Amino acid sequence: MKKTLISIAVSITAMLPALSHAELTSEQQQQLEGIHQLLSDNPEIIADLHANLQQYVENQQQLTKAKQQSETWLNDTTIHSVTGNPDGSTVIINFTDYNCPYCKRLDNVLAKMAGKNADLKVINIYVPLKQQVIDGLETNSAAFAIKVWQNAPEKFAEVNRLLVAKPGLHDKTSIEAVAKKTGTEEYLTGDTAINESLVKNYKTFVALGLRGTPAIFIGDEVIPGFIPYDKLEEIVKKHQAEQKS
């Protein structure tokens, strides 16, 4: 029971940073009064709640710092591939892995949305958690895709589509088949700079507090895991409306 009360209080109090920048609505005022009443009725949770809130504040500060430090890196499209409009003003940062089934589902959602929204720019940050090395190749699916993007961007969309289309893990046969079909065999070679960029992607992923793929950032919102098209469409429309206001 004590843990439940602490969890509730932390969840409500987590809204405080946002509330500090705006006039309180009647609902928000009621929620704040609820916090006070909760603590008054259950004083035994105050010490634990205080510790939890301190940890929450520290985590938020670390996340803010990590976002600021990684902003230039995450938006560098000379390194990271783009789905949609490279000049779009609505930007989604997509942490993804070609060997992750939920990532592939989300990549299809993002591609569909980019096809219907001319101002949408999806920057793909590859984090190959499931497979760093493929037997018999000098590369892997992420490194191959990046090399195509950097050297033959006109071929990237089809390479990406085929990499996403394969169920399960990629292997030497599947990667070579994609390369042959798209005329990109020359990009199956290893590349030290690209490998280093993948390492930096992973370090950024961890610094941002992410623990799995897929995960997307849109504005200040972080969405972990798969999200269906209709839900993502609502978020994108809301973000675009805020951009215009």
Predicted regions and their residues:
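Aromatic-flanked redox-active Cys/Sec active sites in thiol-based oxidoreductases
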Residues: 94-100
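C-terminal cap of thioredoxin/glutaredoxin-like
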Residues: 23-28, 33-37, 178-245
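Structural alpha/beta surface segment adjacent to cysteine/selenocysteine redox centers
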Residues: 93, 104-180, 206-211
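Bacterial N-terminal signal peptides that target proteins for export
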Residues: 1-8
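The canonical Cys-X-X-Cys-His
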Residues: 100-106, 216-217
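Extracytoplasmic/secreted proteins, especially bacterial periplasmic and envelope-associated proteins
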Residues: 30, 34, 41-48, 105, ...
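A short beta-strand-turn-helix
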Residues: 73-90
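N-terminal targeting signals for export/organelle localization
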Residues: 10, 14, 18-72
